[in-house]
Amino acid sequence: LYSEVEMSKVTTQIVKPPICEEEPKGMAAKSLDHCLLYGTNAGETIQWFREVVGFAMAECVYKPDGSILVAWLTGSNKAHDVAILDYDKPGKLHHVGFNLEDWSAIGHAADIIGRYGISLDIGPTRHGITRGQTIYFFDPSGNRCETFAGGYAYMPDQPLRHWDADHVGEGIFYYDKVLNDRFLSVVS
């Protein structure tokens, strides 16, 4: 038995084949998840979010003098809705985070970042603080964005989780445990 078949017009690319055969349909962000704000008077700002907005502090990093370097605050059962970092300039945005379903969705977001040549900052990786999985990247205007999945469920009666400044690298980037200058200094 023998048959001749015409080659399909749609074929798998064999030279530099893409990860995905079909164009991806976006990162599938479920919602805006959180933001990290940099500014002067972090202690006062943290207190303002707690007293005026009604947020609770779920986690923090202490400076050697015992003051707070950065705090993760929540008004829900998420590990954080906003984080506040003590910085030498007022009113800066470090990043906006988008909520994704799970670690697999973070991988899909990484595929999209690679496919479209999006400026990657860090990741995929995982946070020690909040326990979330993440990728940081830049939008076309230069603003840092994050995809975020997972994290623990915050309960109002749980004790404050805290870190010291010597271990903040592990808290932010659990796998390699190192912060880089660009991650700390590039703000909008």
Predicted regions and their residues:
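Catalytic cores of nucleotide-enabled group-transfer and carboxylate-activating enzymes in metabolic
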Residues: K16-C20, G26-A29, T45, V53-F55, ...
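Conserved active-site tyrosine of GNAT-family acetyltransferases
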Residues: T45-R50, I113, F137, G142
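A conserved beta-strand-loop-helix scaffold within acyl/acetyltransferase catalytic domains
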Residues: S3, C60, K78, Y87-D88
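Core segments of cupin and vicinal oxygen chelate
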Residues: L37-A79
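Vicinal oxygen chelate
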Residues: L1-A28, S31-T40, A71-W72, K89-S188
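A short beta-turn/loop motif at secondary-structure boundaries
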Residues: K63-D65, D88-P90, R126-T130
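Conserved beta-strand in the GNAT
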Residues: V82-I84
